[in-house]
């Protein structure tokens, strides 16, 4: 990118120097073991480098009457001193010199006597060489970065195409770990009962398949839900009547010996007119076994609204039920009224509209209570 600091000339030239050094085939053995091959190898490698690397001092012309432009090549920095300048002394037409990577150079042919005049390396000439080489290396660096950027962009586009191909549906292309609109998450399960609450505002879901105590349950629904619907925060008469009528029907339901594991995927709907949780508890106590079946991915909590103590006192002092063999059902059915009475005696502990997930405020399902008792 344009904001990053470009690499320095030494960093850019590092790989180039290594490549030139090893391409020159340096002789690491002592010179006395193989003296004749030293000079030709360096001269030939320097000529090969001339075709690959351009030197900025290539256009420098040697001085002399018949001398033409010198052929300057770039050799290895490490062996610059060992490379000799060769010229045709007889004719004096041209000379072949070697300049180092740092800017060293050889001289052109003399005016006829074959004398080699070395070129004076000025600071401006070296700076010019370094500037041009730096521009050349930066250009190569940008080209390499551009190629890598295009590859990354292409791979990103391929990834986007794969995601689009997978689609949002739960089909064979459905990806894992990505939440989409069509996925069945716990949030969707929690929102289903809320959407269905508007269908039944009468007080209880019509999902009871009971023959023996259907009449008593319908009476309980009519009295409890009706009382809760017309009750207010200070209205104690209607709420009390709903609570007192709910308990005997609970006993009849418990004595009937019916199955309590009916699977209903609805919370008990809250009526619009209900302002206190007393009528809600007294209403759903009668069929708590049916409406409060095990709900997956749901957290059972209650909203507590401050109410007067007299409003919930009838439900707190419910009559003792007749003894029967379903002791677990009786205990679980009695628990909401007990917790409600405890909550009503301390109305200032809870703030309006807040949810308090305290263990004592939960309603225990009979199956869960039986499992806990067995453990």
Curated annotation (Swiss-Prot):
Keywords: Biological rhythms, Cytoplasm, Nucleus, Phosphoprotein, Repeat. Phosphorylated with a circadian rhythmicity, probably by the double-time protein (dbt). Phosphorylation could be implicated in the stability of per monomer and in the formation of heterodimer per-tim. Residues 69-91 have a biased composition (Low complexity). Residues 145-156 have a biased composition (Basic and acidic residues). It is found in: Nucleus; Cytoplasm, Perinuclear region. Residues 245-254 have a biased composition (Polar residues). Residues 28-118, 140-189, 220-254 are annotated as: Disordered. InterPro entries: Period_circadian_regulator. One of its GO terms (molecular function) is transcription cis-regulatory region binding. It comes from the Eukaryota. GO terms for biological process: circadian regulation of gene expression; entrainment of circadian clock by photoperiod; negative regulation of transcription by RNA polymerase II. Residues 92-113, 224-243 have a biased composition (Gly residues). One of its GO terms (cellular component) is perinuclear region of cytoplasm. Its main location: nucleus. Forms a heterodimer with timeless (TIM); the complex then translocates into the nucleus. PANTHER family: PERIOD CIRCADIAN PROTEIN. Essential for biological clock functions. Determines the period length of circadian and ultradian rhythms; an increase in PER dosage leads to shortened circadian rhythms and a decrease leads to lengthened circadian rhythms. Essential for the circadian rhythmicity of locomotor activity, eclosion behavior, and for the rhythmic component of the male courtship song that originates in the thoracic nervous system. The biological cycle depends on the rhythmic formation and nuclear localization of the TIM-PER complex. Light induces the degradation of TIM, which promotes elimination of PER. This is Period circadian protein. It comes from Drosophila capricorni (Fruit fly).
């Amino acid at each position: 990118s344009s904001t990053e600091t470009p690499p320095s000339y030494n960093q850019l030239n590092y790989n180039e120097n290594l490549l030139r050094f090893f391409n020159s085939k340096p002789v690491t053995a002592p010179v006395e073991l193989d003296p004749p091959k030293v000079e030709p190898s360096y001269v030939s490698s320097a000529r090969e480098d001339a075709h690959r690397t351009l030197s900025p001092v290539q256009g420098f012309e040697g001085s002399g009457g018949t001398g033409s432009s010198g052929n300057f090549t770039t050799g290895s920095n490490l062996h610059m001193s060992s490379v000799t300048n060769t010229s045709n002394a007889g004719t004096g037409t041209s000379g072949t010199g070697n300049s180092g990577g740092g800017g060293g150079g050889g001289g052109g042919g003399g005016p006829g006597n074959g004398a080699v005049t070395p070129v004076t390396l000025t600071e401006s000439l070296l700076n010019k060489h370094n500037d041009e080489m730096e521009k050349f290396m930066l250009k190569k660096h940008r080209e390499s970065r551009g190629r890598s950027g295009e590859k990354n962009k292409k791979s990103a586009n391929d990834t986007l195409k794969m995601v689009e191909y997978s689609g949002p549906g739960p089909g064979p292309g459905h990806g894992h770990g990505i939440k989409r609109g069509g996925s069945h998450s716990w949030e969707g399960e929690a929102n289903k009962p809320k959407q269905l609450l508007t269908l039944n505002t009468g007080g209880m879901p019509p999902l009871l398949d009971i023959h023996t105590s259907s009449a008593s349950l319908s009476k309980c629904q009519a009295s409890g839900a009706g009382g809760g619907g017309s009750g207010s925060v200070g209205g104690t008469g209607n709420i009390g009547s709903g609570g007192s009528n709910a308990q005997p029907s609970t006993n009849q339901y418990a004595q009937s010996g019916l199955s309590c594991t009916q699977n209903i995927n609805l919370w008990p709907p809250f009526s619009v007119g209900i302002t206190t949780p007393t009528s809600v508890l007294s209403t759903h106590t009668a069929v708590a076994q049916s409406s409060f079946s095990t709900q997956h991915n749901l957290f059972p909590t209650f909203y507590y609204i401050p109410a007067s103590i007299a409003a919930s006192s009838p439900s707190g002092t419910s009559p003792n039920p007749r003894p029967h063999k379903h002791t677990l059902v009786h205990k679980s059915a009695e628990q909401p009224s007990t917790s409600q009475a405890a909550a009503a005696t301390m109305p200032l502990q809870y703030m309006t509209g807040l949810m308090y997930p305290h263990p004592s405020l939960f309603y225990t399902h009979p199956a869960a209570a039986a499992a806990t008792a067995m453990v």
